[in-house]
Amino acid sequence: MTALILKRVAQAIPVMLIVAILTFLLMKLLPGDPAILIAGDGASPETVERIRVELGLDQPTVVQLGQWLWNLFHFDLGRSFLLSQPVSQAIAERLPVTISLALLAFAITIPVGIIMGVVAAYLRDSWFDMGVMSLALLGVSVPSFWLAILAVILFSVTLGWFPSAGYVPFLDSPLGWLRSLILPASILALFQIGYLARMTRSEMLEVMDQDYIRTARSKGVSEYSVLSTHAFRNALVSVLTVSGYIFSLLIGGSVVIEQIFALPGLGRLLVQAILARDLPVVQGTMLFLGFLFVAINVLVDILYTIADPRVHYD
């Protein structure tokens, strides 16, 4: 197992390097000059040029990329143009909000999605089964921002059940933390519940058609034991892999949700940095999210192998 972990980590290193290089090059394609942004609209050309020299923007792209990778190797993501603080500090301050939102949405998605998928498989071709498939289609076709706006209008503005914006830290008030996140987390989870339910249903149907399931039923094993002990346990391996992918999607989907609900997380930080052309923050945030996705995939691969020792990665 140790060899597997070391192998997966070693395979992830070049992927992370590619993510870092692509992040830097994509930022070069953004319009606007950071030096002009820092200097202000009324700054003289001499002032703008001086700032460009100080930031190293006058250097060739290859030199800037080398400096960026060197700083990254020393865990230096640079300094924000507008926040006047290190990018790593800005990310660290907002990371708990994004992780809290994603974890709460994940805690909603996994049990609800799995239960719906299992029941839909058991009640194949029933109204409940068709409802689950409709929910999965809804998650693919309906934009998250549109549903989030409707939820704010209904549950916050009209009914007043939940706050429409803002975030309460967990240590300040656990109940306030839950009230500030339950609505955005539910909207974020809704789009993944249908996907997980459909995947669970598909895996359950495939397992339930196997010979050993029919053998268990012929021996008089209760239907509950057939579903929970035999069918679900074997279908769980594939569901585990999808769960890691879903958590990555929840973190990525938080960008839109945080913006609508004014949550001070990484997604909102990224959007504000893009609008303000704060390139160090954009680079650092995108790079951190990319590394986080890679780390999640590595962890899922390891858990997948633990859950099913028959699986081997070349």
Curated annotation (Swiss-Prot):
The chain crosses the membrane at residues 12-32, 101-121, 135-155, 177-197, 237-257, 286-306. It is found in: Cell inner membrane. Residues 95-304 form the ABC transmembrane type-1 domain. It is a multi-pass membrane protein. GO terms for cellular component: plasma membrane. It holds the Pfam family BPD_transp_1. Signal peptide: none annotated. Its main location: membrane. Belongs to the binding-protein-dependent transport system permease family. PANTHER family: DIPEPTIDE TRANSPORT SYSTEM PERMEASE PROTEIN DPPB-RELATED (PTHR43163:SF6). Probably part of an ABC transporter complex that could be involved in peptide import. Probably responsible for the translocation of the substrate across the membrane. This is Putative peptide transport system permease protein BRA1092/BS1330_II1084.
